[in-house]
Curated annotation (Swiss-Prot):
InterPro entries: PDI_thioredoxin-like_dom, Prot_disulphide_isomerase, Thioredoxin-like_sf, Thioredoxin_CS, Thioredoxin_domain. This is Protein disulfide isomerase-like 1-4. The lineage of its organism: Eukaryota, Viridiplantae, Streptophyta, Embryophyta, Tracheophyta. Residues 543-563 have a biased composition (Polar residues). Residues 529-542 have a biased composition (Basic and acidic residues). Glycans are attached at residues 82, 185, 315. It is an enzyme of class 5 (isomerase).
Length: 563
């Protein structure tokens, strides 16, 4: 292998002696070269000010202008500078993470402001606020904001997703429910017996008093958990009914799950709302969870992010599910065990495709969750001991991740190189070349709009041997050094620096802007190769395209489709 240090020295020498710069290039060639644009080019260049020079995607531009100014008097504007202090001084806070250009955020704005006004008499209990996620990107990343608007409701600093309707009435109603007493009192054995016979799941706290600090913590925890009822009692006979020692130190708490082998789970952590809510969220689910559209939110929003998934066809489930369930008992509170019916077209097929699983063979897979989304496959026989060993190695970070990939293309001679998971190292991470990589999704409208422009960029730069222009289908391929942040994501990998994080392109998606970006960050200087002028003149004479073209049409703004 070529020495990396020698390569860096060589690159540094090239940089010191290079006299060319981006400003030396004749960029008019990139702007005004109408000769290579077909008359029917859907991405055709337009004159500035042309009535057609707008973005066709009204998802982002519709409704930008408001008929009337919005009174946001009661909406607090938060930033990284005041966010933590504001949450510390307000027990209940609803926060909208928005982007100024987002049409859905603009549509929400009047309802959100009206909801804040309606709730203003309860200012001592709740506040509505907003954060510009395009400015405070660290805050958005901290709270895993992946689309706009994202609305979170914080209780004692603990966030909970708001997934209700984006109307004033829905927001006000939802918040009022969160502010209402979330815990019910049990004072008699008869009341307790009704709970035991009538509810599949319940939380019971045994307290010295049904009011005070401990009761407040239980009430706050109940507001963080929608799917289970919370109860409190000071009656020792009720405690006995739930197998709690009435003489034991209070407060104490137990989770009832009638449908499970282990029907009672006792809590021994700090008596704080967030800790209690985490305990409930981690323990309310069964040992093995069947993935359906209804159960998906509770599975993937669970505080336990790491999962072991069993993919098996329906008629084989009776053989493998008991094995899977037995293995799961050793990892309660550490891992979620999830059963996926492989031949279920509604859920099984798309989930299997997401993880790159083909065929109908029974498969056990470990998944790290949405933060880094690494997958690991169990090799060998599916047995209790093998699954347990696999899960233990997963927790101890001893496994090698799997990354899905399409087959390497047999021919790859185009101006834009086709990258898949298996050949990214050879094409993009080649230390001797600068590389620009677009990660796209076939269904993404912004990717489709970018394609003609990106192809033109590849065509203009095809004669530069030190530079690679490439693209990869991010829905069918994965690589640890190419992680998309929405689609399209455009990443630049400078030569000699492939061990560093790639540089993300955030500018307008035009040939000129992408060219300037490459020129700025390229390790190996290059000069734009303009085609022969006589050939250009001949092509222009044959073209019906306008000769007075000023700018290439593109989305113009760095919009992305969500993952």
């Amino acid at each position: 292998m070529r020495s990396r240090s020698l390569l860096l020295v060589a690159l540094a020498t090239l940089l010191l002696h290079a006299s060319a710069s981006a400003s030396d290039d004749d960029l008019d060639y990139l702007i005004d070269n109408a000769d290579d644009i077909p008359a029917n080019d859907p991405d055709g260049w337009l004159q500035e000010g042309s009535p057609d020079d707008d973005d066709d995607d009204d998802l982002f531009h519709h409704g930008q202008a408001q008929d009337h100014p919005i009174d946001e008097t009661h909406v607090f504007l938060l930033s990284a500078a005041n966010f933590s202090d504001f949450l510390a001084s307000h027990r209940h806070v609803m926060v909208e993470f928005y982007a100024p250009w987002c049409a859905h955020c603009q549509a929400l704005a009047p309802d959100y402001a009206a909801a804040a006004a309606d709730l203003s008499p309860l200012a001592h209990q709740v506040a509505l606020a907003k954060v510009d996620a395009t400015e405070d990107t660290d805050l958005a990343q901290k709270y895993d904001v992946q689309g706009f608007p994202t609305i979170l409701f914080f209780i004692d600093g603990v966030p909970k997703d708001y997934n209700g309707a984006r109307t004033k009435e829905a927001i006000v109603s939802w918040v009022n429910k969160k502010l209402a007493p979330g815990v019910q009192n049990i004072t008699t054995v008869d009341e307790a017996e009704k709970i035991l016979t009538g509810e599949d799941k319940a939380i019971l706290a045994v307290l010295d008093s049904l009011s005070g600090a401990h009761s407040d913590e239980i009430a706050a925890a109940s507001r963080l958990e929608d799917a289970i009822n919370f109860y409190q009692t000071s009656n020792p006979d009720v405690a006995k009914l739930f197998h709690l020692d009435p003489a034991a130190k209070r407060p104490s708490l137990v989770l009832l799950k009638k449908q499970e082998e282990e029907k009672l789970t006792f809590y021994d952590g700090p008596f704080k709302a967030s800790a209690i809510a985490d305990f409930v969220s981690a323990n309310k689910l069964p040992l093995v969870n069947t993935l359906t559209q209804e159960t998906a939110p509770s599975i993937f929003d669970n505080p336990i992010k790491k999962q072991i998934l069993l993919f098996v066809v329906a008629n084989e489930s009776s053989k493998f599910l008991p094995i899977f369930k037995e293995a799961s008992k050793s990892f309660k509170g550490k891992l979620l065990f999830v059963f996926v019916e492989r031949d279920n077209e509604e859920v099984g097929e798309p989930v299997a495709n997401y993880f790159g699983i083909t065929g109908q063979e029974t498969t056990v897979l470990a998944y790290t969750g949405n933060e880094d989304a690494r997958n690991f496959f169990l090799d060998g026989e599916i047995s209790v001991e093998n699954i347990k060993r696999f899960a233990e190695d997963f927790l101890e970070e001893k496994l090698t991740p799997f990354y899905k990939s399409e087959p390497v293309p047999e021919s790859n001679e185009g101006d834009v190189k086709i990258v898949v998971g298996k050949n990214l190292d050879q094409i993009v991470l080649d230390e001797s070349k600068d590389a620009l990589l677009e990660i796209y999704a076939p269904w993404c409208g912004h990717c489709q709009e970018l394609e003609p422009t990106y192809n033109k960029l590849g065509k203009h730069l095809r004669g530069i041997d030190s530079l690679v222009i490439a693209k990869m289908d991010g829905t069918a391929n994965e690589h640890p050094r190419a992680k998309p942040d929405g689609f399209p994501t455009i990443l630049f990998y400078p030569a000699g620096k492939k061990s560093f994080e790639p540089i993300t392109f955030e500018g307008d998606r035009t040939v000129v802007e992408m060219y300037k970006f490459i020129k700025k960050h390229a390790s190996i200087p290059f000069k734009l190769k303009r085609p022969d002028s006589s050939a250009t003149k001949t092509e222009k004479d044959q073209s019906t395209a306008s000769t007075n073209l000023r700018g290439e049409r593109s989305s113009g703004t760095n919009f992305k489709d969500e993952l």
